[in-house]
UniProtKB/Swiss-Prot annotation:
A GO biological-process term: muscle contraction
Superkingdom to which the source organism belongs: Eukaryota
Protein name: Tropomodulin-3
Organism per entry: Homo sapiens
Localization of this protein: Cytoplasm, Cytoskeleton
Phosphoserine: residues bearing it: S25
GO molecular function, one term: actin binding
Length: 352
């Protein structure tokens, strides 16, 4: 189908567009502009300088001679007298001459120190060695040289001048190596989660940045029927609201999971609210970590968190740094109350 069309185009290759446009009359050019306006009404294919229509096609009102106009303007400028000043210049100087202020010269006067006669007599009669000992005791090391300090300290410690050194040696800096990457095999963990492997109790996907969003949703779908995984962590995996919504649907069904960690992700208030609403019906989850998201969640979301913690008595650990005092206090009281209930149940079980 394409070959006949290309053969028809061969006829127009050698045509000169400029010559065709030059042979068109003014009426034909206007018709061509109308057709082009229908094809491209916003003139998106034209440069910005050519989108405005020509509005200067008017008949001249008279002859125009540039040289004659310039000579006329020059003649008018020479014949026109300058306007005289209404207030003549008298040469009077106004204002004050700027004189920089001289900064006061600071003079230091030596303070006269009066000592007790006994101390003054002792310092006057003291030898250089005794004065060096006194300076070393007082910590005034800038008053004595390194040689004198060596003679004083070395003689007292039994060290000669050749082997004496007062250079402070710094400790070696211990190298801090980067943490190794997460060794978890994502595909294998997903397969074992779907198969409900009894030996798979904890899934740790922390700091694995390249997990696709559909794969994280598959984990949430697999956890709906899994009865062995008790701890699931996907911190710093670039999870977003769709992932949070998928895990919220999982929490409504799952009755085994005890801990869920979604910290340091891109979840907004919409995803967090979905998780909070799911926990109203969940009676098994005891720990939830949702802190350090990309953006602040806001007061309304924090109030819903506090309300959920007051209604759900099974949450014992809640990882989130509240920004408002009211929700923070309510959440702290609710967590304390839930832990007290667990302690009372344990005590009652011990008595029985």
């Amino acid at each position: 189908m394409a070959l006949p069309f290309r053969k028809d185009l061969e006829k127009y290759k050698d045509l000169d567009e400029d010559e065709l446009l030059g042979n068109l009359s003014e009426t034909e050019l206007k018709q061509l502009e109308t057709v082009l306006d229908d094809l491209d009404p916003e003139n998106a294919l034209l440069p910005a300088g050519f989108r405005q229509k020509n509005q200067t096609s008017k008949s001249t009102t008279g002859p125009f001679d540039r040289e004659h106009l310039l000579s006329y303007l020059e003649k008018e400028a020479l014949e026109h007298k300058d306007r005289e000043d209404y207030v003549p210049y008298t040469g009077e100087k106004k204002g004050k001459i700027f004189i920089p202020k001289q900064k006061p010269v600071q003079t230091f006067t030596e303070e006269k120190v009066s000592l007790d006669p006994e101390l003054e007599e002792a310092l006057t009669s003291a030898s250089d060695t005794e004065l060096c000992d006194l300076a070393a005791i007082l910590g005034m090391h800038n008053l004595i040289t390194n040689t004198k300090f060596c003679n004083i300290m070395g003689s007292s410690n039994g060290v000669d001048q050749e082997h004496f050194s007062n250079v402070v040696k710094g400790e070696k800096i211990l190298p801090v190596f980067d943490e190794p990457p997460n060794p978890t095999n994502v595909e294998e963990s997903l397969k074992r989660t779907k198969e409900n492997d009894a030996h798979l109790v904890e899934v740790n996907l922390n700091n694995i940045k390249n997990i696709p969003i559909p794969t994280l949703k598959d984990f949430a779908k697999a956890l709906e029927t899994n009865t062995h995984v008790k701890c699931f962590s996907l911190a710093a995996t670039r999870s977003n609201d769709p992932v949070a919504t998928a895990f919220a649907e999982m929490l409504k069904v799952n009755k085994t999971l005890k801990s869920l960690n979604v910290e340091s992700n891109f979840i907004t208030g919409v995803g967090i609210l979905a998780l909070i609403d799911a926990l109203r019906d969940n009676e098994t989850l005891a720990e939830l970590k949702i802190d350090n998201q990309r953006q602040q969640l806001g007061t309304a979301v924090e109030l819903e968190m506090a309300k959920m913690l007051e209604e759900n008595t099974n949450i014992l650990k809640f990882g989130y740094q509240f920004t408002q005092q009211g929700p923070r206090t309510r959440a702290a009281n609710a967590i304390t109350k839930n832990n007290d209930l667990v302690r009372k149940r344990r005590v009652e079980g011990d008595h029985q």
